Amino acid sequence: MARAKFERNKDHANIGTVGHVDHGKTTLTAAITMALAAQGGGKAKSYEDIDAAPEEKARGITINTAHVEYETENRHYAHVDCPGHADYVKNMITGAAQMDGGILVVSAADGPMPQTREHILLAKQVGVPSLVVFLNKEDQVDDEELLELVELEVRELLSEYDFPGDDIPITTGSALKAVEALVANPNIKRGEDKWVDKILALMDSVDEYMPLPERDVDKPFLMAVEDVFSITGRGTVATGRIERGRVKVGETIEIVGIRDTRSTTVTGVEMFQKTLDEGMAGDNVGVLLRGVQKDDIERGMVLAKPGSITPHTNFEAEVYVLTKEEGGRHTPFFPNYRPQFYVRTTDVTGTISAFTADDGSSAEMVMPGDRIKMTVELINPIAIEQGMRFAIREGGRTIGAGTVSKILK
């Protein structure tokens, strides 16, 4: 069977459901796909389809994620649902499925729970740009005032973690009631069922409130150097995959990381032995650099738009430590532990000086399976920025994965 072509006639965004374990994330995901399928936007998926999520490996960590897609009138969404709490945490930290926005699901019957707080905090730390809220299980609440109280609590919680709590759209409804209605009649149109309408209203709020991600090609140029060659009579070529932006022949770029930053001019861009006028995000290219010796540049450096990224050694990070079963350590580690940090294309040794738990208390040791905030100092400066993902390795095996939450130096 020929593969269907991906039609790019609508703006695309990645979205995920966030929330406490029994508040209805997966049921909501099913309700959204069914409600939009009834309007002609994609295929309906049942709870069972989504819950039996296949395992994925991201940076060596096994994560259960279900990928679902659906369309509103204006946009195409790829939706990630993680059945388990641990999967959710791992997914966010490793960026297995990068989210452009999230739907925070809170049970109107129970109000915010400890995990709700944890997810909002995590969304903030790993850089999920925007959230909208769905208060689920409205059918179980007969008191209007109780709904208002829960809404108020959720808004306060969002504001506490620097999300615009007062502005975030909150929709109430019942995912289960919507699913039941759509199972009985899979072609319910807008205005025919109050519970289905509430799901469509939620998606309207996502369409309106969630900004589209900036496309990778529009961001400032960055390419991690994977290999370096010298071509007699032409100069030095750095090869790698362009992470973002575009690079044209004749442009000035900077070589950043490990040694002092220096600038150079791009004298050629090649891909598959063909010359290009410009390379774009996603391309695997060779970039010819003027006046640079082969010894001046090495794997682990990056080529970047001048001034767009700087080298750093000290940062704070949000990290998930692999369990023994996932191939991680069998024993805990302590402050001053010195593993390798695998950033983009290279390992750099670093010292982990301190750990803190979510509540800000300092932890004495870190166990396999923990999620922790840590302070790191690398032995060499590397091009680092907030939100960047990395792996922690020891003797070539991955023992953790993290996201830079704050640059210190």
From Swiss-Prot:
Task: Please provide the record's keywords in A-Z order.
Answer: Cytoplasm, Elongation factor, GTP-binding, Hydrolase, Magnesium, Metal-binding, Nucleotide-binding, Protein biosynthesis
Top-level EC class: hydrolase
One protein family per Pfam:
GTP_EFTU
Task: Give compartment(s).
Answer: Cytoplasm
Question: Which CDD domains does this chain map to?
Answer: EF_Tu (cd01884), EFTU_II (cd03697), EFTU_III (cd03707)
G3: annotated segments: 81-84
Q: What is its EC number?
A: 3.6.5.3
Where is the region G5? 174-176
- Binding of Mg(2+): at which residues? T26
tr-type G domain residues: 10-214
Q: What does this protein do?
A: GTP hydrolase that promotes the GTP-dependent binding of aminoacyl-tRNA to the A-site of ribosomes during protein biosynthesis.
- Subunit-structure text: Monomer.
* Alphabetical list of NCBIfam families matching this protein: EF-Tu (TIGR00485), PRK00049.1 (NF000766), PRK12735.1 (NF009372), PRK12736.1 (NF009373), small_GTP (TIGR00231)
Q: What is this protein's name?
A: Elongation factor Tu
Q: Which taxonomic lineage does the organism of this UniProt entry have? A: Bacteria, Bacillati, Cyanobacteriota, Cyanophyceae, Oscillatoriophycideae
**Which gene produces this protein?**
tuf
